[in-house]
């Protein structure tokens, strides 16, 4: 039954590819659809590109205990047959190259400057903020349990939301927000705290910068590609609270200025330049 379904997917995808008369093939997911697209391209000797958005092996290990080598091996099988694989940051690119991934190119991220911008009046800046998925793999508990004189607000949902809300009643969990309402949370925060150890970029980081809010986090892939010590935030190898205390001293004007390199025009240019013609 499963083989029959896979065959139908492959045949349907083949028809769509042939009818599209496309110039380029980019496969953005590693799941069943991505594997099907990869199979078609290899069978027909069509060059294609892929991308890696997250540290998926680390996520799988944190949640299910599956060894890193197993998942990394599967990802290398999927991506190393591509002409190019797009990655978010230089540090993640270096890590992947050390793990045996090949033909990696940089593909950054941007933000909507019509929504994310500093508060003209300077803002309230009275709390510490986390925005993102409320889940164990985000290491959010490092933020929740951290001693702080400032209140803490968590924006976002996820599988650990209810349990963390019960465990940390002093933290204000406000749920999922978007658009101007989300931007207002950024603007009114004294510091944006990003405790994750497994993100490859973190769009929330540049959204915070665009609102003039300095970042505190750990010195790991993702944050260390974006945060400039004393300019737009602070990172620490072990102590999140120390990073927060330093970030609170950072000028919000220089923080905002550092966001200006993250434009969607640059992102689009990087993507277009990475594509490989199918014919």
Over which residues does each language-model region extend?
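Acidic anion/phosphate-binding donor-loop and adjacent secondary structure
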Residues: 111-126, 162-163
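Short alpha-helical donor nucleotide-sugar binding micro-motif in glycosyltransferases
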Residues: 17, 177, 184-189, 271
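Donor nucleotide-sugar binding/catalytic pocket of nucleotide-sugar-dependent glycosyltransferases
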Residues: 72-118
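A charged, aromatic-enriched C-terminal amphipathic alpha-helix characteristic of glycosyltransferases
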Residues: 238, 249-277
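Aromatic "clamp/platform" in nucleotide-sugar-dependent glycosyltransferases that forms part
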Residues: 197
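Conserved donor-binding/catalytic core segment of Leloir-type glycosyltransferases
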Residues: 120-155
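Nucleotide-activated donor-binding/catalytic signature segment of Leloir-type glycosyltransferases, i.e.
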Residues: 162-180
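Short hydrophobic beta-strand element within catalytic cores of glycosyltransferases
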Residues: 214-217
């Amino acid at each position: 039954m499963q083989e029959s379904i896979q065959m139908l997917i492959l045949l349907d995808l083949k028809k769509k590819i042939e009818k599209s008369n496309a110039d380029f093939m980019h496969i953005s997911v590693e799941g069943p659809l991505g594997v099907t697209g990869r199979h078609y391209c290899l069978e027909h000797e069509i060059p294609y590109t892929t991308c890696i958005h997250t540290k998926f092996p680390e996520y799988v290990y944190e949640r299910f205990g599956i060894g890193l080598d197993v998942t990394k091996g599967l990802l290398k099988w999927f991506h190393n047959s591509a002409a190019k694989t797009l990655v978010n940051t230089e540090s993640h690119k270096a890590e992947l190259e050390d793990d045996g991934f090949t033909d990696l190119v940089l593909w950054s991220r941007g933000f909507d400057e019509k929504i994310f911008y500093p508060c003209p009046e300077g803002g309230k800046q009275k709390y510490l903020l986390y925005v993102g998925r409320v889940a164990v793999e985000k290491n959010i508990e490092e933020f929740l349990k951290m001693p702080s004189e400032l209140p803490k607000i968590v924006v976002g949902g996820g599988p650990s939301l209810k349990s963390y809300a019960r465990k940390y009643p002093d933290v204000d969990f406000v749920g999922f927000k978007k658009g101007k309402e989300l931007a207002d949370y950024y603007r009114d925060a004294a510091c944006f705290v990003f405790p994750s150890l497994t993100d490859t970029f973190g769009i929330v980081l540049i959204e915070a910068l665009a609102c003039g809010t300095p970042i505190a986090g750990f010195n790991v892939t993702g944050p260390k590609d974006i945060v400039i010590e004393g300019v737009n935030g602070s990172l620490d190898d072990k102590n999140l609270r120390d990073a927060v205390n330093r970030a609170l001293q950072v000028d919000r004007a220089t923080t905002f200025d550092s966001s200006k390199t993250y434009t969607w025009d640059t992102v689009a240019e990087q993507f277009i330049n990475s594509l490989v013609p199918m014919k």
